[in-house]
Every structure is written in structure tokens, then in C-alpha cells.
């Protein structure tokens, strides 16, 4: 250590306090990285890795660096790679410091704590989430978006429900107790853990006394109950870990975290991880894209905060009928008033992301352009309020009352900040003329400088008679008078020599020196004063953060309502009836996304009736590609849309509010967790049977297909019986299957109905009619579907042959079908039932073929039938 330079010793001391972060160490105009940080960062950032001496034992020290004024994109790239970055600044002026400059970490940027807009997706939250297992079956979940100040907590029962909240929040970073490090990956969902940064917090942070003290101190309350968080012990422990982490990384600059909202999952329609994925609520299954999801369809929002609010509504549909109807009323009024919708959109399109502007202003990381954007946004509010004054629905009226134009804030910014300020704060040009008297005076001095120099130069030329005399400036000598050597004899006595050149000499005069001190001092003072004034304005705006947050939330809500109204009007959706009953009735329902994407083909609508009586469980049979999965997803999506307050794609709908939607649709191996397709399927089915209630909606597609036929039929049959017979989980259920044996359940169970997807056979082809009709399907048409998929003709013909053998019902020991392995017999071209007689029955055949059936009387027909009977 003694061989290290003082600077490297300082670096290593600071680095020791931040071992899990890449340390950006400020050296002049650069952030430097050393040792392992340099090696890692140079690889991620694709920048040059170099080295220099004076490391331990005299070894070379790997290093790389980036300019401090353009560090943001480099930091963003490291964060995107899952790294944390500790920003270490010089906290002393090198000009006035002897020895090593004092440095300290001013903040740590982590994947879950990003505030720079360039690194954030506009219409998605960037959550830091905290999980805490109370070891009593209850899990605390808390999550924060530092860029907006949104901070929420809840408690759930069990591991699966906790990870369901993780799936909903979709955090970039997850905090867990350090003692949970070893089993975090095993206990967690592999697919949910992928791509997220895990941070392990010291166990003592979760101590309940410390938790309560931290919560009370931050929010300035006497007890957590003042925040509405009574009865959330584990949730508060999770939230305290977030606050502790903020203190460690943000160095206390989190004043904009002013509210902690507790919620019960029972207040919303519960959607587990599998259901969110299978229904493609916010991203498609195949590509993970927004387009093709329900969010992609419904999002017509004009603001980023509106887009985030819509995502929240989709993730948390309502279960309280009055609140749903309140939203429906507002959507209906907007849908029926195109002029009002257009006016709202025009106003909102000029509104910036107020939530994130508020966050940056409160964190003192905003620039002058952020304040100008805030002013422009606030100026859009008065005309918007004029539009809303005439609205008649309760929710729109509440929004109108709650949106604050904050006139004095807009006036302060307009008076204090120029309309087009520079990006860099410390270069001046930010504060408007007329805002501050001293600044105006200093600017006058600076602006008059050129005129003063020109006048002084003319005066000196006249006084000395030296026509070639020049007054110039450089950074080393400041202002000076330059005289050629041929004119040195004409210089006055008050000229003071400053520099001798080959062909000239440079001088100053007392008058020029006095001007220099005044002008240069003025320019330095201008920059210093402007920055100070800007900070004062920013602090004044930050003090109104709560008002701004409330206004932003109401504008976001208005934006979502207008977006839903746009879609409802354009796509001819209906307002569904909502009640607390048990009936789910949809007339001519359509799949919202499929209908919108396939504009060239008319979507075939379908009806559905489910209740807790004789229509509790509907078994749906029919071939692949016929539309079973689309139909079932469409029912689930219509229910979800109705409960988030949207209109729905149907001619009429009545929705008895459901408490949960479960889907078991499709499957794939989860290699990260060592689980097969069948295991994933069975785990999801088990979760449904454990958690479903009579108020739930269950969608099951092809239960049991991941194992042998007999096992699959048995499991599917037993699951259907359980959902029917067990009162605790007798949910309204759509059950699609290829096992036609299950249609027999409608005979033995009073609340089971059979439906199938209609098809039409024509010229050995199958035509899918996409219509759900009563009754079970008679065929699966799998071979026809295989032909449509392009399987080789040899495979198709062999499949027909095997199917023919299987339909004979021949099985070997153990239930395995007997399939001929010898020379292939040609697959029959027609069903064997079409030939009623053997070829040797010539007399019988001749008698039948000679009959003119159309000419027979009933009596003649009976006599001939008796004759034929005697011939057999």
C-alpha cells in the first residue's frame, strides 16, 4: 500500500465502500475507472483500456475513462447491462486545495434507481421492488419508481402470490434480505428472475423497530397508521428496505417520495403470472412485443404518464361495481362527444411527463429545459379545464376540480427562465432579463465591453499617433495593447510593458486593467449568480411537488379515459352491464386484438353464457386451428376489459364481477427451473384448483396433453369433476379439450354443458367456421390440419393408415395401440361402414340394385323388405 500514489490510496478507500458498483472517479474533466472496474467497463462500453504505473507492488494499473460532461450515455449503457455505478465527485476546488482533492460518492445509480429520461421507457415504470418473507406464510411486497415518486406496498399469502406481484410490477431491480441469497434463485421463478438485478440487504434492516422508526422519520408521521398502513407489518418491512437503500445510494435526496400507498390485492381482480402471460396483456407471447397485446390495442394516450396509468389499470382491474361504473360513465360521455375528445387530446399532446419532471426537480437533477417544459405543460391546463367544465359525469367532474393549473409556478418560471435555455447549467444564458437587478447590471457591463474596447483603441491611437495600435485579449495575459517595434518611441509613460515579442511589444494601462477586472469579474459573477438564481427557482418549484403530483395523476387518468373512449368509438364497442351477480353473458363477442390486427378478414363473433348454475362448466371440443383458444381468451379479455372500466367488443354483455381470472393455455419447458412442459402444466393447474373460488373465471386449454393418452384423459376428467363438484372452487369454467370422452360428463354432471367449434367438410377438406355451437365434436380433424400445415404427403398417408388401425380398437398389453409394422396396406379411401355387404352376396346385390325406390308404394316396400330378410 505504501507504494501506491495518494490518489490511488484514496480511490481504493472509496471503492472499498462500494464493492458491488463500478466507481466513476472524478479526475478533472473525466470520470476514471481503475483495476477490475476498468476491465469490466471497457468491455461493456467498448472503450479503450489502458494502464499506468504506481499500483500495488509497482504493477501497472488498468484504467479507462469517459468525459464527465457526456457521461450520461455511458452510465445508461452500464445500467442496461445490469451494473451499478457509484458517482464519485471532487467536493473541493482543486485551485484552492493543497495536496489531494477531497472526493466522495454523491449518488449510486442502479437499474432500479434511474431518473434520467434518456434511460427510461416513457410509458413504463422503472420499479425497484422489495420482497420480504415473514416466515408466517405472508410476504411483504413494496415497490418504488424513483423517477415518478410512486411508492406502494402490499401483503400477500404465499410465494406464488408474491411472485405474481413481481410479474405485475416488472421491476428492474429486486431487494431481498441477505440471508435469502442462497435460495433466492431456487425459490424465485426462473423466468421472472432473468434479466433483473438482485441486491441483498443486511438482515438487521428488517428489524421492526428500525422499520417503524425509518418510516416515521421519512414521512414525518407519528405512526405508520397515519399513512393508512396499519396491518401491513411485512409490507412495511419491505418498504423500509427500499427507504434504507435510498439513503445509502441517493445520499438523502429523496424528498419527492412523499406518499406510501398500501393496497390489498383483494381490492382488484387478481391475475397470476401465467394469466398475464397467456392473455398477452402487455406483451405478446411469441416476441415479447407491445404490438399485438391488449395494452398495444387500448393505448391511445397522449402523455407518457397516461400510458403508465393505462398499464396499471390493465394490471389491476377493479372488483368494486360502483368504481367500475364511474369509469364507464366517463368513457361513455367521452365516446359520445368527438369534439370533447379531440379538445382533450389537443391539450394533452402539449403536456410533458409531469411525474418525471417532478421527480427530477425534487432530486435537483433537472435542467433549465425541464422547468421550461413544466411551464409549457401548465399553460395547457386552463383551456383543458374550460372543456371539462361542461361535463356531466362524476369522475370527469372530480378530475376537473382536482387539476391545478399552478399559475404562480408557471409565472415564476416564465419570469425567471429564458424560453430556450442551454443544456449546460454552468455556462450562463439561463435567467431572463429583468428578473434580477444585479444580473442585469453585470450583463450590461459585459455587453458594453466590445464598445468600450473599440472606443479605447480609437482614443489611444489618437493620443499616441500610432495608427497600427491594437487592443487584444488572450486567456494568459487578459486584455493588452500591442505596439509594433517601429512605434515604441511614441508610447506614453503610463504604458506598462507585459510581454516582448519578435516584432512587437504588449502593454497595459491603469484604465485597461481596471476595465479588465470589471468585465472579467462580471462574466464570472454572471455565471455564478445565474446558477444560484436557477437553484432558487428550482427549489421554489420543488416545494410545490405535492400539488404537481396530484395534478399529474389526474391528467393521466383523464388521458386514459379519453384513450378508452377513442378505442370504444372507433371499434364499435358496447358498454357492458356490471353487477355483483354470478352470470357472465356475452352476445356476439369478439377477440379485441385479433379483430384489430386482421382487418382484411371479418371476425366471427360468438356468444357465451356462464353462471354458477347449470352453465358453470362448458367443455369445448373441436379441431386444432378451429378457434377454441381464441374464443376462450376473448372471453377472459372481455371480462378484464369490463372490470378496468372499458367498453368491450360485443353487441351486448353482462358481467358478474369476478375475483380472479385463471388461464392454463399452452405450455413450454422451463429449462431454467428444470421443469418439463407437463410439469409446468400440472403446477399451473394445481394453483388453479387451490385458489379458484365460485367468483372466479377459469380458462383451461388441453389439460393433460403433455403425457400419455390414458393419463391425460384421466387427469382432464378428474380436474373437470373437481371444478364441478367442489363448492369451494366451483368457478365459471371454459374447458377446451381434444379428449372427446369428456363430453360424457354433461350426462353425469348437471352444471356441465358441451360446445364445439363448427366445421364443414367439403371435397376431403375441412373448413373452419369459427362458430361455437352446442354439442360435442365428432372428429378432431388432426390429419386435415397436418395437411394444411404442409406435412409431406407420405406422412399424411401413413397417419391415415395408423388412424384406421387405431379406430379398430386394437391394443397390446399395457394399453399401447397395435400398429402394423409390416408392408403398408393402402389407407382406405372411404369409411368401412359404407360397404354393408361382402362381394359374394350377388343375389342380394342384384335384387337391391334392380329396385326403383322412387316408384315403390309403402306396402310394396314392406313386402320387398320381408323378402330381403328371408334371403339373408
UniProtKB/Swiss-Prot annotation:
Keywords: ATP-binding, DNA damage, DNA repair, DNA-binding, Nucleotide-binding. ATP binds at residues 622-629. Disulfide bonds: none annotated. GO terms for biological process: mismatch repair. The keyword DNA repair applies. GO terms for molecular function: ATP binding; ATP-dependent DNA damage sensor activity; damaged DNA binding; mismatched DNA binding. The keyword NAD does not apply. GO terms for cellular component: cytosol. CDD domains: ABC_MutS1. It holds the Pfam family MutS_II. HAMAP family: MutS. NCBIfam families: mutS1, PRK05399.1. This protein is involved in the repair of mismatches in DNA. It is possible that it carries out the mismatch recognition step. This protein has a weak ATPase activity. This is DNA mismatch repair protein MutS. It comes from Geobacter metallireducens (strain ATCC 53774 / DSM 7210 / GS-15).
Amino acid at each position: 500500500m505504501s507504494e501506491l500514489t495518494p490518489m490511488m490510496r484514496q480511490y481504493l478507500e472509496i471503492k472499498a465502500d462500494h464493492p458491488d458498483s463500478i466507481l466513476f472517479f472524478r479526475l478533472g474533466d473525466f470520470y476514471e475507472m481503475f483495476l477490475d472496474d476498468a476491465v469490466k467497463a471497457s468491455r461493456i462500453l467498448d472503450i479503450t483500456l489502458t494502464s499506468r504505473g504506481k499500483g500495488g507492488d509497482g504493477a501497472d494499473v488498468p484504467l479507462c475513462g469517459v468525459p464527465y460532461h457526456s457521461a450520461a450515455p455511458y452510465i445508461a449503457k452500464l445500467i442496461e447491462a445490469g451494473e451499478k455505478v457509484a458517482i464519485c465527485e471532487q467536493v473541493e476546488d482543486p485551485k484552492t486545495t493543497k495536496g489531494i482533492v477531497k472526493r466522495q460518492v454523491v449518488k449510486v445509480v442502479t437499474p432500479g434507481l434511474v431518473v434520467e429520461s434518456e434511460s427510461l421507457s416513457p410509458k413504463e415504470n422503472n420499479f425497484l421492488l422489495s420482497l420480504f418473507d415473514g416466515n408466517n406464510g405472508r410476504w411483504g411486497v413494496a415497490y418504488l419508481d424513483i423517477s415518478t415518486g410512486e411508492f406502494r406496498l402490499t401483503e400477500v399469502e404465499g410465494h406464488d402470490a408474491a411472485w405474481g406481484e413481481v410479474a405485475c410490477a416488472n421491476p428492474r431491480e429486486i431487494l431481498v434480505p441477505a440471508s435469502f441469497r442462497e435460495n433466492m434463485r431456487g425459490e424465485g421463478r426462473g423466468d421472472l428472475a432473468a434479466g433483473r438485478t438482485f441486491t441483498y440487504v443486511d438482515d438487521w434492516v428488517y428489524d421492526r423497530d428500525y422499520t417503524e422508526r425509518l418510516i416515521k422519520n421519512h414521512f414525518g408521521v407519528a405512526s405508520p397508521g397515519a399513512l393508512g398502513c396499519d396491518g401491513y407489518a411485512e409490507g412495511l418491512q419491505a418498504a423500509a428496505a427500499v427507504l434504507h437503500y435510498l439513503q445509502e445510494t441517493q445520499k438523502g435526496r429523496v424528498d419527492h417520495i412523499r406518499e406510501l400507498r398500501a393496497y390489498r390485492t383483494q381490492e382488484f381482480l387478481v391475475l397470476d403470472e401465467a394469466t398475464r402471460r397467456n392473455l398477452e396483456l402487455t406483451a405478446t407471447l411469441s416476441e415479447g412485443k407491445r404490438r399485438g397485446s391488449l395494452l398495444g390495442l387500448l393505448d391511445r394516450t397522449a402523455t407518457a404518464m397516461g400510458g403508465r396509468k393505462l398499464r396499471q389499470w390493465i394490471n389491476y382491474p377493479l372488483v368494486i361495481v360502483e368504481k367500475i361504473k364511474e369509469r364507464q360513465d366517463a368513457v361513455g360521455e367521452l365516446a359520445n362527444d368527438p369534439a370533447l375528445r379531440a379538445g382533450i387530446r389537443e391539450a394533452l399532446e402539449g403536456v410533458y411527463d409531469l411525474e418525471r419532471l417532478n421527480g427530477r426537480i425534487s432530486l435537483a437533477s433537472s435542467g433549465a429545459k425541464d422547468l421550461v417544459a413544466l411551464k409549457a405543460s401548465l399553460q395547457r391546463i386552463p383551456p383543458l379545464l374550460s372543456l371539462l367544465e361542461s361535463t356531466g359525469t362524476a369522475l370527469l367532474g372530480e378530475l376537473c376540480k382536482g387539476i391545478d393549473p399552478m399559475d404562480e409556478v408557471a409565472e415564476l418560471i416564465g419570469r425567471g427562465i429564458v424560453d430556450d435555455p442551454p443544456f449546460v447549467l454552468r455556462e450562463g444564458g439561463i435567467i431572463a432579463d429583468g428578473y434580477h437587478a444585479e444580473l442585469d447590471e453585470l450583463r450590461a457591463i459585459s455587453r458594453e465591453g466590445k464598445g468600450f474596447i473599440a472606443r479605447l483603441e480609437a482614443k489611444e491611437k489618437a493620443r499616441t499617433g500610432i495608427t497600427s495600435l491594437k487592443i487584444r485579449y488572450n486567456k494568459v495575459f487578459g486584455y493588452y495593447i500591442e505596439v509594433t517595434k517601429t512605434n515604441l518611441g511614441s508610447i506614453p509613460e503610463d504604458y506598462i510593458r507585459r510581454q516582448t515579442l519578435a516584432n512587437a511589444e504588449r502593454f497595459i494601462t491603469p484604465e485597461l486593467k481596471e476595465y479588465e477586472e470589471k468585465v472579467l469579474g462580471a462574466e464570472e459573477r454572471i455565471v455564478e449568480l445565474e446558477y444560484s438564481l436557477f437553484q432558487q427557482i428550482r427549489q421554489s418549484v420543488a416545494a410545490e411537488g405535492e400539488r404537481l403530483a396530484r395534478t399529474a395523476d389526474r391528467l393521466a387518468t383523464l388521458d386514459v379515459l379519453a384513450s378508452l373512449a377513442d378505442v370504444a368509438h372507433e371499434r364499435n364497442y358496447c358498454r357492458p352491464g356490471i353487477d355483483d351477480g354470478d352470470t357472465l353473458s356475452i352476445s356476439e363477442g369478439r377477440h379485441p386484438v385479433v379483430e384489430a390486427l386482421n382487418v382484411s378478414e371479418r371476425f366471427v363473433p360468438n356468444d357465451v353464457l356462464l353462471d354458477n348454475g347449470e352453465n358453470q362448466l362448458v367443455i369445448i371440443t373441436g379441431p386444432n386451428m378451429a378457434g377454441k383458444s381464441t374464443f376462450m381468451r376473448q372471453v377472459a379479455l372481455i371480462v378484464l376489459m369490463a372490470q378496468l372500466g372499458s367498453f368491450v367488443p360485443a353487441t351486448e354483455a353482462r358481467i358478474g364481477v369476478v375475483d380472479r381470472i385463471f388461464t392454463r393455455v399452452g405450455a413450454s419447458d422451463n429449462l431454467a427451473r428444470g421443469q418439463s412442459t407437463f410439469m409446468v402444466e400440472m403446477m399451473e393447474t394445481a394453483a388453479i384448483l387451490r385458489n379458484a373460488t365460485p367468483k372466479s373465471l377459469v380458462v383451461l386449454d388441453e389439460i393433460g396433453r403433455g403425457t400419455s393418452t390414458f393419463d391425460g384423459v384421466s387427469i382432464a376428467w378428474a380436474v373437470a369433476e373437481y371444478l364441478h363438484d367442489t363448492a369451494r372452487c366451483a368457478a365459471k369454467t371454459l374447458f377446451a379439450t381434444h379428449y372427446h370422452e369428456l363430453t360424457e360428463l354433461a350426462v353425469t354432471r348437471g352444471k356441465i354443458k358441451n360446445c364445439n367449434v363448427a366445421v364443414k367438410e367439403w371435397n376431403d377438406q375441412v373448413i373452419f367456421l369459427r362458430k361455437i355451437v352446442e354439442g360435442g365434436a365428432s372428429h378432431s380433424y388432426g390429419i386435415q390440419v397436418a395437411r394444411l400445415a404442409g406435412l409431406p404427403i407420405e406422412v399424411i398417408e401413413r397417419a391415415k393408415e395408423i388412424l384406421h388401425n387405431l379406430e379398430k380398437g386394437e391394443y397390446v398389453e399395457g394399453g399401447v395401440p397395435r400398429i402394423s409394422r409390416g408392408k403398408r396396406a393402402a389407407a382406405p379411401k372411404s369409411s368401412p361402414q359404407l360397404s354393408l355387404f361382402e362381394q359374394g352376396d350377388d343375389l342380394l346385390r342384384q335384387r337391391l340394385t334392380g329396385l326403383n325406390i322412387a316408384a315403390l308404394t309403402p306396402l310394396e316396400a314392406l313386402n320387398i323388405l320381408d323378402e330381403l330378410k328371408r334371403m339373408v
